[in-house]
Amino acid sequence: MSSRHPSPAPRLDPAKFRDPRVTARGEPRAAVALGGLRTLWFNTGTLCNITCRSCYIESSPTNDALVYLTAAEVAGYLDEAEAAGEPLVEIGFTGGEPFMNRDLPAMLADVLARPARYRAIVLTNAMAPLRQKARALLDLRDRFGTDRLILRVSLDHYEAAHHDLERGEGSFAKALDGLVWLAREGFTVHVAGRAAFGGEDESTLRAGFAELFARHMIPIDAADPVALMLFPEMDAGADVPEITEACWGILGKRPDSVMCASSRMVVKRKGADRPVVVACTLLPYDPQFELGATLAEASRPVPLNHPHCARFCVLGGGACSR
């Protein structure tokens, strides 16, 4: 019988991920060039209505390390991208819980109203903050339709017990209630789960989610890897190989398949005068991935100098958007 709580992985060799240019073995470290900005993420703030046991960004009701962005700040970056002719397709909002930011509806309206017809995606737990913005969401639906507004709801597992273990007792029922409401109101909904959670393989997880969606009349195809994203586990302290320049050929992967080849994220640190641009949604705190205050400054290549670069993006094939 497979274990639902596997043995801990070997811990990371402290000699790894020290130098952005070379690995612990002295081999040239892989770096990823920005091939064109197709997805721009905004971290709306790290405050969240719940505290999750394994949150990679440590969001909680008290963590305001990344403060709320304003609609004007978001508009400034969108204006910069458009003036530079960036091939933007998708604008993402993450947190924390984005619906705790009172400016989120205005941000979404700005994105959806622009002539470029961007797609907007919001990562949400679909709990109380979303329901408190229900009227604003319905107004956005009525103004802009639902084709270009995607709500991706976090459900760690298709069973309440596993989800609640991470997010608190009763959180699964509340998230599911929000997901059902969104589906009933005609919004485009996706779900984000965890690929290795519960000790099950991917086919079992997708079958479990498919049954859940069918039972609650949620129009999500559980076989679609975009509509149901199953993310690799992230443990920055677990051992993982470093990615060298030679790894692309060995693994049969291309640098342009990695998130930082086509995306950046805007954050605003507590006490800062203005936002900054970081290389990756997963690494908002690490100073080596802070690239500058503008999108132009943030266009330089990104050395893959963090365990998440290897485990999540290159080896795990993860991406926050497709």
PLM regions: where:
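Short, flexible loop/turn motifs enriched in small residues
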Residues: 48, 146-147, 258
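Conserved C-terminal portion of the radical SAM core fold
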Residues: 89-91, 119, 145-155, 170-240
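Accessory C-terminal segments flanking Radical SAM cores
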Residues: 232-322
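Short, P/G- and charge-enriched loop/turn segments at secondary-structure junctions
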Residues: 28-30, 140, 249-254
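Conserved alpha-helical substructure of the radical SAM core
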Residues: 8-95, 99-114
